[in-house]
């Protein structure tokens, strides 16, 4: 990211089971970490899977017809993985896309609860828990319908609230408003696939211009390679380490209040997310196969 070489303030976030966050510039750095990604892991959502060919990674919902357009991860070389079989499940970035689109289309409300009139026949109930059909059995690669449960949505909302609260807490600690952030670097294999527009829509990350967000990929592997291949890089790592002040989130008195406020879509304070417009949004699907369901 080279954030330690510039005067402007940047964020660096590694999103996984935990969120590791650094804010700062060439003169100072502050870091913290907290649990923010459990709901995004494979196996947590009913249809959750690791990112792989044939897995849903993007969703668009037409707000007028509530028709779904599903994007899946292609095979290497760009061949559609779902050419001979339907989607197998959904990865974390696809889940963020899906919930974002459900909210924009009015199929879930501010608390993430299903709106029956908007969901129509897609919504069923089992043991008192709502399930929304995303892909019908005849179109899925498993032969079973791929569904999103109310429990899945509730888990994602807790995770996104934790992520936003971590960012808010560390920014408040150093008295830097989000609008003063010049670059927001997203690291980690999973974090690199998140659609920033969708993450903003659900209130997971700040409502900043999309060009603020920069995907870095697997920075831990790249950093380890640099350290192994160059003495100067090793010295730089030690210098950066010594610059960092660590913030303990578990002793922060305001954290739980901020967390409670963030457990809504996108937030209890809608002024924090002026670009999020319900019943619409940026309805584009990234590269991959598109399947109307």
Residue ranges and their predicted role:
Residues 3-6, 27, 61-64, 100-108, ...:
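Generic secondary-structure signature for well-ordered alpha-helical cores
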Residues 157-179:
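Phosphate/ATP-binding catalytic cores across multiple sugar-kinase/actin-like superfamilies
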Residues 96-158:
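Gly/charged contiguous loops adjacent to phosphate- or pyrophosphate-bearing nucleotide/cofactor binding elements
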Residues 2-89, 93-94, 195-217:
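Glycine-rich phosphate-binding loop of actin/hexokinase-like ATP-binding domains
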Residues 150-160, 203-226:
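Glycine-rich and small/hydrophobic secondary-structure elements
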């Amino acid at each position: 990211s080279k954030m330690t070489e510039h005067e402007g303030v940047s964020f660096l976030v590694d999103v996984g089971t935990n969120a590791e966050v650094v804010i700062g510039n060439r003169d100072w750095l502050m870091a913290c970490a907290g649990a923010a990604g459990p709901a995004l892991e494979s196996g947590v959502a009913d249809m959750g899977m690791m990112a792989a060919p044939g897995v849903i990674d993007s969703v668009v919902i037409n707000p007028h017809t509530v028709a779904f357009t599903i994007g899946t991860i292609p095979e290497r070389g760009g061949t559609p993985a779902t050419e001979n079989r339907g989607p197998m499940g959904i990865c974390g970035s696809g889940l963020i896309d899906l919930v974002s689109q459900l909210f924009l289309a009015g199929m879930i409300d501010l608390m993430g609860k299903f709106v029956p009139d908007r969901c129509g026949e897609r919504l069923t109930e089992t043991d008192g828990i709502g399930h929304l059909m995303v892909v019908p059995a005849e179109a899925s690669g498993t032969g079973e319908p791929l569904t999103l449960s109310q429990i899945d949505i509730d888990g994602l909302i807790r995770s996104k609230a934790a992520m936003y609260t971590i960012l808010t807490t560390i920014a408040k600690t150093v008295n830097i408003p989000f609008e003063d952030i010049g670059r927001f670097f997203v690291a980690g294999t999973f974090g690199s696939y998140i659609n920033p527009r969708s993450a903003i829509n659900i209130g997971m990350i700040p409502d900043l211009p999309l060009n603020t967000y920069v995907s870095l990929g697997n920075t831990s592997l790249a950093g380890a390679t640099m350290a192994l291949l160059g003495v100067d890089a090793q010295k730089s790592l030690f210098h950066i380490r010594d610059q960092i002040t660590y913030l303990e989130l578990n002793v922060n008195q305001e954290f739980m209040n901020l967390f409670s406020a963030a457990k809504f879509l996108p937030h209890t304070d809608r002024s924090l997310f002026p670009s999020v417009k319900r019943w619409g949004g940026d309805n584009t699907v990234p590269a991959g196969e598109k399947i109307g369901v």
